[in-house]
Amino acid sequence: SEGKHIIVERYSQDGRLTEALNYNLDSLNVIDHMVVNGLGENEKATLYKNNLLPFNSEEEVTFASKFSGFVDSTLMLLEKNRVIMDTLSLEVFSNKTEAFRIKENASYTLLNPFTEKEQRQDLTLYYIFAKGFGLVEWYDEANKSHYKLEEILSQDKWIKMLTR
């Protein structure tokens, strides 16, 4: 309904779908945000701000979404602010390519509407996007979690992995 789009899905280590973002291909703005709630059901989140990808180093973009929390009757508010930190040259699968690093300040706020209590967790993440590949690396500020693209799976291989 809003032109061509692309859906990016996130999975847990055990292969369960946890989140999906539906991007407009022309603007790269988020059209829809889906999360899997505490009952294991797909739920459409409420989008307040829909931009996750800055286009230049002067731009700061904001994404904000609200959805059911993982505990009964709670709500989760997700807020992300992103800027391009720098550009770099790196090697991806033996190909030297241009890339840019994004810094993300994220806050996850768990809201209980009955007790009016809030629990907030802030974190800083870094994402590296390489020309011709997309997202190739991401890590947290303390480098406790660091992920790097090691293989691009074919559709058949991905399906086989999920159906084991």
Language-model-derived ranges and their functions:
Residues S1-R164:
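Conserved functional acidic sites
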